[in-house]
């Protein structure tokens, strides 16, 4: 017998509650919904935040600040060790190479972070670099070329 073959006995399984099946069941008549009203009807109930027609709290409170997330620059981050490991033996790594290897989604802005080691002189193209990544690339004799956009 295997773990996926185990199952509880029929009498141990809890039956689902079937409402509206006679008063003897304890859930007959109004089926636990109370008497009349919007909540007793099929599809009844109000949407979250609805306060019965009075001005809801969300609209009574003033707006504050601004929403910067609409204009925030989003970068796909790649660590330096990951980048150098994926392109061993290559001296120049372009954005197209990064996209082709699947390290970032095609067309996405790429930022290279300095986690990992860079032992070979390599020329790397990306939209942004962290200070530690630039330092490690230059220390190994390579070049970090930041692109615009």
Swiss-Prot record:
Disordered: region residues: 14-57
UniProt entry keywords in alphabetical sequence: Ribonucleoprotein, Ribosomal protein, RNA-binding, rRNA-binding
Task: Give the top-rank taxon of the lineage listed in the UniProt record for this protein.
Answer: Bacteria
**Any one cellular component term from GO for this entry?**
cytosolic large ribosomal subunit
Which InterPro entries does the record match to this protein?
Ribosomal_uL15, Ribosomal_uL15/eL18, Ribosomal_uL15/eL18_sf, Ribosomal_uL15_bac-type
Give the UniProt record's GO annotations in the biological process aspect. Answer: translation
- Which Gene Ontology molecular function entries are recorded, alphabetically? rRNA binding; structural constituent of ribosome
Bias (Gly residues) occurs at 21-35, 42-52
- Subunit architecture: Part of the 50S ribosomal subunit.
Q: Which family does it belong to?
A: Belongs to the universal ribosomal protein uL15 family.
- What HAMAP family is this protein classified in? Ribosomal_uL15
Q: What does this protein do?
A: Binds to the 23S rRNA.
The name under which this protein is listed is: Large ribosomal subunit protein uL15
- UniProt source species: Oleidesulfovibrio alaskensis (strain ATCC BAA-1058 / DSM 17464 / G20)
What does the record give as the organism's lineage?
Bacteria, Pseudomonadati, Thermodesulfobacteriota, Desulfovibrionia, Desulfovibrionales
């Amino acid at each position: 017998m295997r773990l996926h073959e185990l199952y509880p006995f029929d009498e141990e399984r809890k039956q689902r509650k079937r409402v509206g099946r006679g008063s003897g069941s304890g859930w007959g008549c109004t089926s636990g919904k109370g008497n009349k009203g919007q909540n007793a009807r099929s599809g009844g109930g109000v949407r979250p935040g609805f306060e019965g027609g009075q001005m809801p709290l969300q609209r009574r409170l003033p707006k504050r600040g601004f929403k910067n997330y609409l204009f925030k620059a989003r970068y796909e981050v790649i660590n330096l060790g990951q980048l150098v490991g994926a392109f061993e033996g290559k001296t120049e790594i372009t954005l197209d190479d990064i996209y082709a290897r699947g390290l970032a989604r095609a067309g996405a802005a790429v930022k290279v972070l300095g986690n990992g080691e860079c032992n070979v002189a390599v020329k790397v193209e990306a939209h942004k670099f962290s200070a530690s990544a630039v330092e490690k690339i230059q220390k190994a004799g390579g070049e970090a070329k930041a692109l615009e956009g």
